[in-house]
């Protein structure tokens, strides 16, 4: 079929539009630590808790080990302020303030929407204060922890300058300080809503931060010009003044007895000032990648906590002789959106992710503290010596990655290609460090693709001019090269090797897929797919290669036959990533058109299509099939989606190409998401899939096909051999009579004789009369046998056990005129002629002939047995005909198979 027709292909049996995704449900987003919103530290006795904002929710860590304690409930808008207050965590988002307790919302208050969003938040005593973007100040009074705060007052300072900082000075009853962008500092009384005093001439520049000193009436005022003013609030005098590079974003006083003041600037530097000597002590450059909106010393400890929009939270300890801090512990993630993600190994414990921030990270799905960045050496110390930023000394951005966990304990097992770099780098996963080998291309051009063999011994790199070099991962020695004799001059966009290192598959931008003998090094075959290949992946369990092309199509190639077996069309823009499912049955693709589509490869149908808020840049399917992990252009985290097909039936009916479901991305808290346990216990089905789920297999596909009863094999085998089984299970010895008990202990025999009354001996009745009395009531077996519904009879027969069926057959009326014999033989003959329940019919007739053989042969008069023998002859005729038909078919198939084997 021409490509144009395939692009226009529609499915006549496509179902109606979906309301939600069939396969995927958002689970949670991982890899988030902090953003530009200032954090909050809460003292709980001798322990400290630090809370950071991550978009629409917050995370709380224990400062002792930086373990993640809990995540707050997701909000509709992004968080702007955090403040701990009594047992609550106050969170401002938009025009509302929410009170959380252990991650759950207890109550909320709000400001008028026309006054803008909340920009500053503070709380002390019974007061809660919020400043808005329109310079309005709201004051609430919180009477008790069980009540919702009541609005006390609202006031608007008489100035056109914006409020830039808010602080409650210690011991100043009902007072707050407001810092403004024009350099003014005002004291306000909350109870009467009046300005008490204003300091205008002391600072000049706009105030950016206010920090309370350990000494009463003293605070540090930071300005936009970099001035740090130590100001006495009581007498309105400047005690000392410092000047740093860049504006002052935050200040903090050390409270363990050492007179040190720390300050931060927008480029991530930390400055430490000796207050006793009134000079700078040292500067820590590039403490963070980007600004530091807040820094704070832990009360009474030489530990400084910092966090910023570089998605990192750090604790610095001052234990060196020169007073310079060192990192005590930290939690961090990518500070730029990841561009590549892949599950490591055969489990879902770790993800490997790479981003444009030039870092390679191991992200744990089990515990946040296990996530770490793979070290690139002493980058920070080298940056200090060269006076450059650390990211400038890191390796270029990673463009391709491959790994194998087979030899991870012995040598490097991760291989990466870097942007505009002519060498690939090895990494050691066990030590989480950069490896010792640098693998250059033989033609000197940049590396475009990499591959690590399944055995972990070989690393393959594809160059920009069509050459593939093979290196030993243990020694870093080059072993062979492919492509010099048939140099295409086009970049090798994918290098793939099968499980046993027998066939090497390469893809290039000229649209040629080449198959090489890996051991001999010669070209076996090549396949032109008709369009430039941008990427390709190998599915080892099924020997399939998926190829993404410039014409927005995906081709599925069988490595054994070297032919295109499927072509998938539906994306309207370039493909960014794709991956096979764990079973190889599905292919999940992502494109710049904003959709993630799932294709069923056996049928070639589109079975799921979702649209995410931002474009997916990379995706990977879990080796266990539990999750789908995705990265997006505007998110520093990694999104996890639960695979619902692990816990319920998923319809594979074709969808229309324009049937796309808009879904929300997974949240950090997992709010409105479906976990693996929830998916297993409570999963709702789509309405359009109910019909497909309730489908039942037909009783018989075709009248010419022999159909079995679908009973377990042991059931009809036991029925045939029931007498032998009973004989085998019979006791070999006669039960022994128990010894006579002492005279003072009654025996069981005595008890039974004493308790069970003797029944009168019944008078002997004739055998025909006894049988007649039994047949009066009848059984369900006998009732259905006398009826006209063969299907109902066999359904009841299938519900019985082997012993019950044997008993019912033996209980057939064995006296002239043998009516039940005739009915039983006839119903079995009709069932056999319909070619249904073949093995059950054979087993029942075998039991019937064995059980009643003596009755059929020892008859009284010929007239009584004529109808029975006529029924048996009819059975014999049908039985011989059907057996001969089956023998002919089996013989034919056996002959064909023997011919094909030879």
UniProtKB/Swiss-Prot annotation:
GO process annotations (BP): rRNA processing
Pfam families recorded: Beta-prop_WDR36-Utp21_1st, Beta-prop_WDR36-Utp21_2nd, Utp21
Cellular component annotations (GO), alphabetically ordered: cell division site; cytosol; mitotic spindle; nucleus; Pwp2p-containing subcomplex of 90S preribosome; small-subunit processome
Stored InterPro entries: SSU_processome_Utp21, WD40/YVTN_repeat-like_dom_sf, WD40_repeat_CS, WD40_repeat_dom_sf, WD40_rpt
Main function: Involved in nucleolar processing of pre-18S ribosomal RNA and ribosome assembly.
Subunit structure: Interacts with snoRNA U3. Interacts with MPP10. Component of the ribosomal small subunit (SSU) processome composed of at least 40 protein subunits and snoRNA U3.
Name the UniProt record assigns to this protein: U3 small nucleolar RNA-associated protein 21 homolog
Lineage, uppermost ranks: Eukaryota, Fungi, Dikarya, Ascomycota, Taphrinomycotina
């Amino acid at each position: 079929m021409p490509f144009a027709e395939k692009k226009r292909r529609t499915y006549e049996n496509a179902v109606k539009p979906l309301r939600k995704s069939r396969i995927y449900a958002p689970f949670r987003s991982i890899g988030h630590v902090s953003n530009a919103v200032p954090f909050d530290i809460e003292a709980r006795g001798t322990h400290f808790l630090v809370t950071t904002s991550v978009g629409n929710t917050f995370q709380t860590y224990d400062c002792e080990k930086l373990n993640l304690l809990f995540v707050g409930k997701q909000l509709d808008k992004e968080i702007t302020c955090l403040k701990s207050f009594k047992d609550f965590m106050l969170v401002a988002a938009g025009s509302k303030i929410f009170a959380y307790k252990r991650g759950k919302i207890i109550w909320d208050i709000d400001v008028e929407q026309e006054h803008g969003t909340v920009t500053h938040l503070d709380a002390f005593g019974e007061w809660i204060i919020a400043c808005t973007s329109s310079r309005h100040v709201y004051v609430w009074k919180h009477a008790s922890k069980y009540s919702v705060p009541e609005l006390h007052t609202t006031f608007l300072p008489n100035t056109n300058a914006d409020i830039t900082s808010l602080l409650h000075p210690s011991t100043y009853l009902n007072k707050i300080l407001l810092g403004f962008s024009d350099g003014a500092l005002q004291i306000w009384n909350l109870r009467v809503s009046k300005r008490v005093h204003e300091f205008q001439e002391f600072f000049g520049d706009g105030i950016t931060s206010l920090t309370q000193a350990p000494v009463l009436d003293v605070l540090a005022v930071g300005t936009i010009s970099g001035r740090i003013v130590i100001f006495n609030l009581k007498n309105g005098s400047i005690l000392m003044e410092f000047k740093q590079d860049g504006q002052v974003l935050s200040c903090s006083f050390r409270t363990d007895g050492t007179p040190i003041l720390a300050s931060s600037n927008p480029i991530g530097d930390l400055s430490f000032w000796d207050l006793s000597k009134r000079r700078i002590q040292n500067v820590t450059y590039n403490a963070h990648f980007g600004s530091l909106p807040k820094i704070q010393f832990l009360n009474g400890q030489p530990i400084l906590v910092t966090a910023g929009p570089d998605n990192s939270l750090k604790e610095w300890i001052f234990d060196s002789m020169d007073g310079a801090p060192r990192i005590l512990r930290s939690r961090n993630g990518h500070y730029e959106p990841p561009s590549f993600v892949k599950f490591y190994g055969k489990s879902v414990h770790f993800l490997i992710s790479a981003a444009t921030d030039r870092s390679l990270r191991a992200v744990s799905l089990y515990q946040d503290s296990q996530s770490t960045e793979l070290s690139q050496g002493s980058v920070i110390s080298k940056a200090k010596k060269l006076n450059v930023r650390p990211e400038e000394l890191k390796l270029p951005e990673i463009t391709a990655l491959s790994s194998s966990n087979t030899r991870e304990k012995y040598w490097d097992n991760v291989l990466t290609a870097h942007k505009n770099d002519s060498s690939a780098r090895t990494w050691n996963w066990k030590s989480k460090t950069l490896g010792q080998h640098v693998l250059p291309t033989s033609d000197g051009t940049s590396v475009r693709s990499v591959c690590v063999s399944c055995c972990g011994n070989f690393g393959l790199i594809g160059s920009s001019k069509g050459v593939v070099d093979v290196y030993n991962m243990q020694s870093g020695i080059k072993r062979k090269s492919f492509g010099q004799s048939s140099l295409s001059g086009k970049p090798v966009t994918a290098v793939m090797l099968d499980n046993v290192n027998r066939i090497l598959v390469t893809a290039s931008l000229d649209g040629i897929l080449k198959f090489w003998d890996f051991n001999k090094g010669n070209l076996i075959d090549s396949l032109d797919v008709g369009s430039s290949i941008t990427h390709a992946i190998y599915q080892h369990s099924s020997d399939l290669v998926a190829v993404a092309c410039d014409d927005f199509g995906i081709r599925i190639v069988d490595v054994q036959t070297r032919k295109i077996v499927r072509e998938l069309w539906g994306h309207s823009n370039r493909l960014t990533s794709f991956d096979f499912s764990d079973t190889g049955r599905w292919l999940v693709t992502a494109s710049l058109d904003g959709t993630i589509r799932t294709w069923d490869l056996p049928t070639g149908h589109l079975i799921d299509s979702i649209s995410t808020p931002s474009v997916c840049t990379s995706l990977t399917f879990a080796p266990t099939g539990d999750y789908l992990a995705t990265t997006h252009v505007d998110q520093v985290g990694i999104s996890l989606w639960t695979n619902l097909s692990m816990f319920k039936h998923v319809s594979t009916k074709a969808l229309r190409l324009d049937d796309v479901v808009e879904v929300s991305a997974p949240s950090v808290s997992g709010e409105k998401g479906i976990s693996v346990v929830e998916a297993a216990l409570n999963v709702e089905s789509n309405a359009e899939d109910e019909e497909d789920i309730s489908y039942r297999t037909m009783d018989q596909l075709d009248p010419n096909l022999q159909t079995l009863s679908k009973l377990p094999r042991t059931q009809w085998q036991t029925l045939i051999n029931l007498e032998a089984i009973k004989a085998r299970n019979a006791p070999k010895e006669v039960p022994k009579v128990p010894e006579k008990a002492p005279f003072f202990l009654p025996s069981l025999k005595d008890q039974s004789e004493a308790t069970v009354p003797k029944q009168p001996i019944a008078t002997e009745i004739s055998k025909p009369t006894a049988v007649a009395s039994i047949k009066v009531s009848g059984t369900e077996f006998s009732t259905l046998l006398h009826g006209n519904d063969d299907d109902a009879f066999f359904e009841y027969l299938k519900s019985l056990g082997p012993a019950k069926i044997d008993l019912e057959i033996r209980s057939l009326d064995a006296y002239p005129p043998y009516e039940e014999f005739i009915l039983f033989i006839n119903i079995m003959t009709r069932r056999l002629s319909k070619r249904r329940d073949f093995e059950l019919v054979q087993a029942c007739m075998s039991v019937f002939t064995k059980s009643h053989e003596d009755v059929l042969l020892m008859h009284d008069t010929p007239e009584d047995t004529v109808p029975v023998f006529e029924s048996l002859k009819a059975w014999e005729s049908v039985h011989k005909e059907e057996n001969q038909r089956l023998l002919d078919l089996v013989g034919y198939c056996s002959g064909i198979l023997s011919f094909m084997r030879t």
